[in-house]
């Protein structure tokens, strides 16, 4: 009797974990398919001769170390100066930092929030910054872009109302940063590139985002959690707005480089994932009836087991089963093999060797993530800040 119960538990657990592995493996394979170049936006931009008027928002909470460099680099754009406005929302930054920012050709906002959040900063900016804009770009305070960033976006804005740029690592100074950068590229491959290749919407990532001004203003005031990017994504997909992924428009982002920051970052992400899942689930019946495939897919994403946990969980179960119940172990090794191949495919070739050298750091990081699970509060809307250095 006890063996029957254990076998049932084994099968149920395998099915639950297999769902996450199969999802990752499926989109990893899709990412290998050839994609025709998208010339629609180029033709539309050429015909309309459009020069988009951009509002660039930098929500900056306690970001004194990085914000000045990021803004100075952005101001090197090869785009017409009178067609973009940079607004920094300075929240809890030092007076000395604000004085330097005031000397730059930007709009500096200095709100005072009882409880700070990125959503509140963006809402404040949309209320305070006046002007005739076509599109809004959201960047984090540590983000650095190339001089042709706006010129590239201008082309896509002729066709798409929501664009996610290619956010990639600007630092690889230790094991944590390397693994965080590799994780970002895996997400880019699975949730952005592969999804677009199937005609599905890209996932948003919190920065390097561009929206039509009207669309953003209609939705930004609906944001209320610390996972504002997931909230925005769910709102857009429920409205059937397609999100375009722009792999050639790079936004260089600082990766977390210490375990405490990693734990805080993952705590924020895991809380946002649970909040998003619980918020989306009641809308699923309506989404099914109206054929909102992107919204359904997004809800499935929120139910996936985080990959780092998946790697350690599968590895641990496979070894334990091999030692204790060899007859039940094969299916677990198959899943682990599928996951390993999928991750190999989704990591860019230039990062593979460097990433796999750091694989032994994963268990320690996963342990910190597991600790987070005990502290997740689905009703928590507090902003969990991770510090930046570069």
Where are these regions (language model features)?
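N-proximal low-complexity "stem/linker" segments adjacent to membrane-targeting elements
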Residues: 1-72
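Acidic helix N-cap motif at the loop->helix transition within catalytic regions
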Residues: 68, 94-102, 148
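Cell-envelope/extracellular polymer assembly enzymes that use nucleotide-activated donors
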Residues: 52-55, 85, 231
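Membrane-embedded multi-pass helical conduit in multi-pass membrane proteins
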Residues: 29-33, 37-41, 45-46, 301-380
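A conserved acidic beta->alpha catalytic loop
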Residues: 87-98, 113-115, 144
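Short beta-strand-to-loop acidic/aromatic patch adjacent to the donor-nucleotide binding site
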Residues: 132-144
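Short, acidic, metal-binding catalytic loop of nucleotide-sugar glycosyltransferases
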Residues: 72-83
């Amino acid at each position: 009797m006890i063996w029957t119960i254990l076998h049932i538990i084994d099968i149920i657990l395998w099915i639950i974990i297999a769902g996450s592995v199969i999802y990752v493996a499926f989109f990893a394979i899709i990412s290998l398919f050839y994609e025709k170049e998208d010339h629609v936006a180029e033709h539309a931009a050429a015909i309309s001769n459009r020069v988009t008027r951009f509002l660039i928002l930098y929500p900056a909470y306690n970001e004194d170390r990085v914000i000045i460099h990021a803004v100075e680099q952005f101001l090197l754009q090869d785009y017409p100066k009178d067609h973009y406005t940079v607004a920094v929302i300075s929240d809890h930054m030092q007076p000395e930092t604000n004085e330097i920012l005031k000397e730059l050709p930007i709009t500096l906002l200095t709100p005072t929030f009882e409880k700070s959040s990125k959503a509140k900063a963006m809402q404040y900016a949309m209320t305070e910054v006046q002007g005739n804009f076509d599109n809004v770009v959201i960047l984090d305070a540590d983000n650095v872009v190339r001089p042709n960033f706006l010129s590239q976006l201008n082309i896509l804005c002729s066709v798409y109302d929501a664009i996610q740029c290619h956010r990639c690592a600007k630092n690889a100074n230790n094991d944590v940063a390397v693994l965080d950068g590799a994780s970002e590229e895996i997400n880019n491959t699975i949730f952005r590139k592969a999804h677009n290749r199937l005609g599905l919407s890209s996932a948003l990532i919190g920065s390097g985002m561009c929206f039509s001004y009207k669309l953003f203003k209609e939705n930004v005031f609906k944001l209320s959690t610390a996972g504002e990017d997931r909230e925005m994504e769910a709102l857009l997909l429920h409205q059937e707005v397609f999100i375009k992924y722009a792999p050639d428009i790079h936004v260089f982002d600082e990766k977390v480089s210490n375990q405490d920051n990693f734990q805080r970052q993952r705590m924020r992400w895991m809380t946002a994932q649970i909040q998003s899942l619980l918020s989306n689930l009641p809308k699923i019946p309506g989404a099914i009836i109206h054929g909102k495939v992107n919204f359904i897919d997004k809800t499935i994403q929120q139910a996936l087991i985080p990959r780092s946990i998946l790697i350690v969980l599968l590895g641990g179960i496979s070894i334990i089963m091999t030692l204790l119940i060899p007859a039940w172990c094969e299916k677990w090794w198959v899943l682990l093999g599928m996951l390993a191949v999928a991750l190999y495919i989704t990591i860019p070739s230039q990062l593979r060797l460097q990433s796999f050298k750091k694989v032994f750091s994963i268990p320690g990081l996963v342990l910190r993530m597991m600790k987070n699970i005990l502290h997740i509060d689905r009703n928590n809307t507090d902003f969990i800040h991770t510090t930046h250095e570069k």
